[in-house]
Amino acid sequence: FGNIYDGERYDANLEIENWCAPSCTYANWQPVKRNTTTNLGAISARLSLPVKAKHIITPKQITTPKNELVFDLGQNITGWFTFMADLPAGVELRVQTGELLQDDCFYRDNLRTALSEYRYISTGKKAFIRPIATFYGFRYIKFSGVADLTGITDIQAWALYSDLEQTGEITTANEKVNRLYLNSVWSQRDNFLDVPTDCPQRDERMGWTGDAHVFAPTASFTM
């Protein structure tokens, strides 16, 4: 299961070994049929820029009053996370994302109905984990379903956005002003995931043209 709001659920026990190899002997494969009745028109190249992984961040584990297993990226991004998992068979790992802390604890109520999570059921074999059918808007990552992080290593976060070239930059003698400007740059990056969106994290994530119309003149000064 996977969608942009609720995230992804992956049961590794259902994997088909070598499913994309010519040598795969999976008995339930069915022959395809050529569609000669539907007129799909000519294939053309995409008009928008490709979405790429533009930054890779190594998060730091933080201590919360609730003793949660939380990592901090130090920057709010749109994208996904990756890690290595070497867990006992049958363990269901839950990974949740959030944008901020409340009372120094993990917080996600601002996401409203969006679950924004990743669930992984282990086969007992070491595996590389990366969501493939969703994306998240987040700064914090919370692990649950395990007592500690034994078997979970190499945690990284990938910032994804359209392959735009940054054309403008502002640097001042005031670090707070610099941070304010950088926040606006990251907000633009986070919401330029193919089409300009209103937000990358909660249960909306729509390409409203009204939002883009208002922001377009400002955006053109940066990218």
Stretches found by the model and what they are:
Residues 214-223:
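Well-ordered alpha-helical scaffold segments within catalytic/enzyme domains
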